[in-house]
């Protein structure tokens, strides 16, 4: 993943997300975001819209189904992902280049809206770390997580801050012998990072 361009785009959905399935059954949702910069003109005392950036985004698997169910045309969204360049020839034989976003995270902007978030069931994030982020079971790293101790992201359902029960704030537990490290360390259930998707 080194050298990839990760960007965050805030804008409005141009169309409803389009959900499709690959022949192997993996879900993919495509949608377009229009991001328009605004500047304040002091002479006219008005906000002026700049030139809009239209970006095609794709998101995969369970997140694709969540996007298709949750988002619709006109909603303001925040999208983070890896910018990709793709070249192709059109019908007239002219070589074209497009930029697309492989989405890692997407959500509704709450600047001028409200939302009630419902966690989907059966969605493990095994093997993914980060601060307080936890994998399923043993594994999931965190800052300073590792075989000797430190803090380890809790992956047990009791530590899930989205669960309906009263979970501890921050979702962190004192570390133990099992589990794997945060930034590239890692023994145990896949706490390190890999170029392979976690599915």
Swiss-Prot record:
It is found in: Cytoplasm, Nucleoid. The keyword Phosphoprotein applies. GO terms for molecular function: enzyme activator activity; single-stranded DNA binding. Residues 157-166 have a biased composition (Low complexity). GO terms for biological process: DNA replication. PROSITE patterns: SSB. Signal peptide: none annotated. Phosphorylated on tyrosine residue(s) when expressed in E.coli. One of its GO terms (cellular component) is cytoplasm. Keywords: Cytoplasm, DNA-binding, Phosphoprotein. Residues 1-110 form the SSB domain. Residues 114-199 are annotated as: Disordered. InterPro entries: NA-bd_OB-fold, Primosome_PriB/ssb, ssDNA-bd. Residues 123-156, 167-193 have a biased composition (Gly residues). It comes from the Bacteria. Homotetramer. The N-terminal 120 residues form an OB-fold. PANTHER family: SINGLE-STRANDED DNA-BINDING PROTEIN (PTHR10302:SF27). NCBIfam families: PRK07772.1, ssb. HAMAP family: SSB. This is Single-stranded DNA-binding protein 2. It comes from Streptomyces coelicolor (strain ATCC BAA-471 / A3(2) / M145).
């Amino acid at each position: 993943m080194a050298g990839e361009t990760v960007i965050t785009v805030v804008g409005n959905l141009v169309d409803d997300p389009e959900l499709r399935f690959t022949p192997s059954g993996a879900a993919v949702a495509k949608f377009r975001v229009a991001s328009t910069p605004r500047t304040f003109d002091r002479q006219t005392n008005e906000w002026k819209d700049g030139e809009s950036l239209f970006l095609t985004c794709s998101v995969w698997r369970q997140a694709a189904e969540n996007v298709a169910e949750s988002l619709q045309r006109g909603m303001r969204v925040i999208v983070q992902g890896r910018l990709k360049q793709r070249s192709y020839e059109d019908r007239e034989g002219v070589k074209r280049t497009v930029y697309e976003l492989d989405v890692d995270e997407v959500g509704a902007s709450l600047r001028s809206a409200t939302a009630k978030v419902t966690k989907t069931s059966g969605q493990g994030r095994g093997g993914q770390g980060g601060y307080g982020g936890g994998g399923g079971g043993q594994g999931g790293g965190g800052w300073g997580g590792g075989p000797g101790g430190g803090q380890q992201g809790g992956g047990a359902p009791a530590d899930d801050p989205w669960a309906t029960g009263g979970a501890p704030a921050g979702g962190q537990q004192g570390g133990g012998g099992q589990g794997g490290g945060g930034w590239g360390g890692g023994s145990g259930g896949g706490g390190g990072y890999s170029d392979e998707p976690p599915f």
